[in-house]
Design a protein with these regions (language model features):
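Interdomain hinge/lid region at the active-site interface
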Residues: 152-222
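Short acidic-hydrophobic, aromatic-tinged amphipathic segments that line or gate anion-handling sites
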Residues: 1-3, 117-118
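Rossmann-like NAD(P)-binding element
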Residues: 3-38
Length: 312
């Protein structure tokens, strides 16, 4: 409703609304913008908006954008000035995108601290369906599985701390956003869901038919591939900068560690006891706001002879 002729002076416009509204704003912008204006978006699905762009005849003006950084938390209070630092920023030009416009947007994403990555819109949607959309759906389903199968005294919920809470952290994401994502990237998500269900069926059949090699091969292949994934670039699912420490259950144990870190200007995001340590974690888990603080804390506490457990 606020789109008026003042937009006619814009050389670059970012559409930062929910995906389902972008097409409406494109339609309103079309008669207003000048011929050399660049329009981009920050939506997590691309094929849908590219279809709208083509129908509106805005292919020369539009370059799709997807900053691959985010958080499971929503709202202004959870904003992060370093959100795009070392994060991939996907750009999806159209067949009619002007090369100089792509160069301009590429340079801008670099100035933001991000790493530009150019790809086709359909390939983008297939990729994010696999590495982001499916994991979010699986995490939400796992949490609801515990909720629905727990007994009346809530023993599953009580014991679900630690590893389970870590692997399902992204289930806390915005329901509205994920409803829209599944609507706009339906085909790609359904394809990868079918592949995943086939994989689960093979695992189930292997367990049912008592074929131990099925499970061994599953974890052997996944471990090898996961270890080859870089930790140096921020991705679609926000990273956790944390580690655990082996500490004795004595008065003052936590405060001593907190004091050591504070004396060295290292800020703690969260600190707490690990009650479920089946993954080999230490009794105390500490989370930080960034990777540098995390690395500094590891080095510092090791110098005080603390036993640090870092998970790859």
């Amino acid at each position: 409703d606020d789109i008026d002729t003042s937009f006619s002076h814009c050389d670059l416009i970012f559409l930062c609304t929910p995906v389902e509204y972008n097409a409406q704003y494109l339609e309103k912008l079309k008669p207003i913008i000048h011929s050399k204006c660049i329009i981009t978006d920050v939506g997590s699905t691309k094929s849908s908006i590219h279809e709208s762009v083509k129908l509106l005849g805005l292919e020369k003006n539009f370059i799709g954008g997807h900053p691959m950084a985010g958080s499971e938390k929503t709202g202004y209070e959870n904003s992060d000035e370093l959100l795009l630092e070392n994060a991939y920023y996907i750009l999806t030009p159209t067949k009619k995108t002007r090369e100089k416009d792509l160069d301009t947007l590429t340079a801008l994403t670099k100035l933001m601290g991000a790493i530009p990555f150019v790809m086709d819109c359909a390939e983008h949607d297939k990729t994010v369906a696999t590495i982001s959309h499916l994991p979010h759906l699986v995490a939400a389903a796992l949490v609801n599985l515990v909720k629905e199968t727990d007994n009346s005294n809530g023993v599953m919920k009580q014991l679900a701390a630690g590893g389970f809470k870590d692997i399902t952290r992204i289930a806390s994401s915005s329901p509205i956003m994920w409803e829209q994502i599944c609507e706009t990237n339906r085909e790609a998500i359904l394809k990868v869901l079918d592949i995943y269900l086939d994989s689960l069926k093979k695992i189930r059949d292997g367990i049912k038919n008592n074929i131990p090699s099925t499970v061994y091969q599953l974890f052997e292949e996944s471990r090898s591939y996961r270890n080859s994934i870089s930790d140096n670039v921020r991705g679609l699912i926000s990273a956790q900068y944390s580690f655990s420490v082996q500490v004795a259950d004595r008065p003052g144990s936590i405060s001593i560690i907190s004091a050591i870190l504070a004396a060295n200007s290292i800020s703690i995001k969260n600190i707490g006891i690990n009650h479920n340590r089946e993954l080999g974690e230490g009794a105390l888990r500490i989370a930080f706001y960034g990777v540098e603080d995390c690395h500094m804390a590891v080095k510092l506490l090791k110098s005080y002879h603390y036993n640090i457990i870092e998970r790859g």
